[in-house]
Structures are given as C-alpha cells and as structure tokens.
Amino acid sequence: MTLNLCVLTPNRIVWDSEVKEIILSTNSGQIGVLPNHAPIATSVDIGILRIRLNDQWLTMALMGGFARIGNNEITVLVNDAEKSGDIDPQEAQQTLEIAEAALRKAEGKRQTIEANLALRRARTRVEAINAIS
C-alpha cells in the first residue's frame, strides 16, 4: 500500500508521486506517516522531509508551511522546498557561514530574529544534503 505525496510551493509542484512512508518536521516535532494514517492538518516547520520509496530514502529541505493528511494522500504546502539532489553543497555551506556571521553581527531584536531564521534555513539545506539516503 502507498501514499500519494504532493509537495507544493507558491510557484511550482516539487513532488507529486506515490511513496511508502514519510517523516515530516512539524512545529510540535517529527511525525511519521504510513498508509492509513489518521487524518490530520498540521503546521510544517523549517526542516527535513524524509521520503521512503521502497528501500530508498530521499530528503527534501522544507521552509515552513502546512500539511494535510487523509485518505492516503498527503498535501504539503510550503514557502519553499528543495530536493537534496538539487542543492549545491558548496553554495549551501557558504550560505550557512554567511548566516552564522550575520547572527553574530545582529543588533536588536528584529535583526536577531531574522538572522536566526536565515540560519535555520541554511542549516536545513545543509542537513538535507548530509542526511543518510
């Protein structure tokens, strides 16, 4: 038995295919979803989406949004998403270093919050590349 997973951003469809299982980062922690999962709607945190296709795991960096699960269909609507294979490792590492430097230099509450968000996004992209597939 499989699940139909659809990952959408405002600009494009990132994924629309059947999967065996997913592990999704929500604001209250990670959840695993298998076929016949109870229906839920949840917020999606900045984090990794792990996708199992038969015996292979793929990863994707998600930049926050919402997910709806029900009737063996998962719809994930996020601000942005990147498949790990589409992320340039050098660019991701540079972005992480820039985000870390920006956080160190942040002055005031607003700059600190924005720098922390940029750092979380950058870390997520690096984690997606380094995740065990």
From Swiss-Prot:
Cellular component, GO annotation: chloroplast thylakoid membrane; proton-transporting ATP synthase complex
Membrane-topology descriptor: Peripheral membrane protein
Gene Ontology molecular function, alphabetical: ATP binding; proton-transporting ATP synthase activity, rotational mechanism
UniProt cross-references to Pfam families, sorted A to Z: ATP-synt_DE, ATP-synt_DE_N
Main localization of the protein described in the UniProt heading: plastid
This protein's UniProt keywords: ATP synthesis, CF(1), Chloroplast, Hydrogen ion transport, Ion transport, Membrane, Plastid, Thylakoid, Transport
Subcellular location: Plastid, Chloroplast thylakoid membrane
Record's function text: Produces ATP from ADP in the presence of a proton gradient across the membrane.
PANTHER family xref list: ATP SYNTHASE DELTA/EPSILON CHAIN, ATP SYNTHASE EPSILON CHAIN, CHLOROPLASTIC
Subunit structure: F-type ATPases have 2 components, CF(1) - the catalytic core - and CF(0) - the membrane proton channel. CF(1) has five subunits: alpha(3), beta(3), gamma(1), delta(1), epsilon(1). CF(0) has three main subunits: a, b and c.
NCBIfam families in UniProt: ATP_synt_epsi
Entry similarity comment: Belongs to the ATPase epsilon chain family.
This protein's name: ATP synthase epsilon chain, chloroplastic
